[in-house]
Structure formats: C-alpha cells, structure tokens
C-alpha cells in the first residue's frame, strides 16, 4: 500500500485478487478459510461457469465455488464439479 505495508488476502484493484502470505498474487484455485475460489492467469477472481481441464464448475457472484446445488439445470456435486 502507500505506506509500504505488504498486503495479503483479498485486494480489489478493478477486479479482486488474492495475495498469499508472502504477498505474491495467487492464480488457479484458492482455498480461503474452507471456501474455494478461482483466479485466472492474470490473477483476477472468476465468476460464472469455469471449465478447468475437462470439468465444469460454477463460481457464484462473490467468487465462491458452488457445491451440492443445481445451477442453470446442471447438478453440482460436493466437490463443486458438474455431475
């Protein structure tokens, strides 16, 4: 920040980004206190449908991964993957 303090956790700079304990920007899957999020290659938090490899996931408007629910008629299991 402006005072030179290293930021960690979620930071908003246009999009939301996750900075790990060493202050490095995280990409890929992020587990924050038991809730899963996904940050793309530029580090921005994703929302909506995500195809990771050959598996579909749904990320809510707040970025959290949906699980054990139905979205747009598609069933998501306990691990968030479309069944």
Predicted regions and their residues:
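Extracellular adhesion/carbohydrate-binding repeat motifs centered on closely spaced tryptophans
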Residues: 1-83
């Amino acid at each position: 920040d402006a005072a030179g303090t290293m930021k960690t956790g979620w930071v908003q700079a246009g999009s939301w980004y996750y900075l790990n304990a060493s202050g490095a920007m995280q990409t890929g899957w992020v587990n924050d206190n038991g809730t899963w999020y996904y940050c793309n290659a530029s580090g921005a938090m994703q929302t909506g449908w995500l195809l990771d490899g050959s598996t579909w996931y749904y990320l809510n408007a707040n970025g959290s991964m949906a699980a054990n629910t139905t979205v747009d008629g598609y069933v998501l299991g306990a691990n968030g993957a479309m069944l």
